Swiss-Prot record:
The keyword Acetylation does not apply. NCBIfam families: rpsS_bact (TIGR01050). This is Small ribosomal subunit protein uS19. One of its GO terms (molecular function) is structural constituent of ribosome. Protein S19 forms a complex with S13 that binds strongly to the 16S ribosomal RNA. Belongs to the universal ribosomal protein uS19 family. Keywords: Ribonucleoprotein, Ribosomal protein, RNA-binding, rRNA-binding.
Amino acid sequence: MARSLKKAPFVDDHLMKKVLAIIENKSPKRPIKTWSRRSTIYPEFIGLTFQVHNGHAFIDVFVTNDMVGHKLGEFAPTRTFNGHGADKGKK
């Protein structure tokens, strides 16, 4: 089910504060480390790099224009797919 149009997109407060601090200070664009996979990508995030936790390690995510409106967690996969079990004796 989609999010209601009455509500604004969700971003964790601590993440937004970090982004605004980087934008205001014009500081070097260091990666922002976050565990907030549920946060929606805003247009202010374009050009920034986030390190999103996937449960095991931090994955670098460089935000581009096409990613706006998606969640950060969509770009840091949590599972690895090794293929379906194959019969080794079958040819």
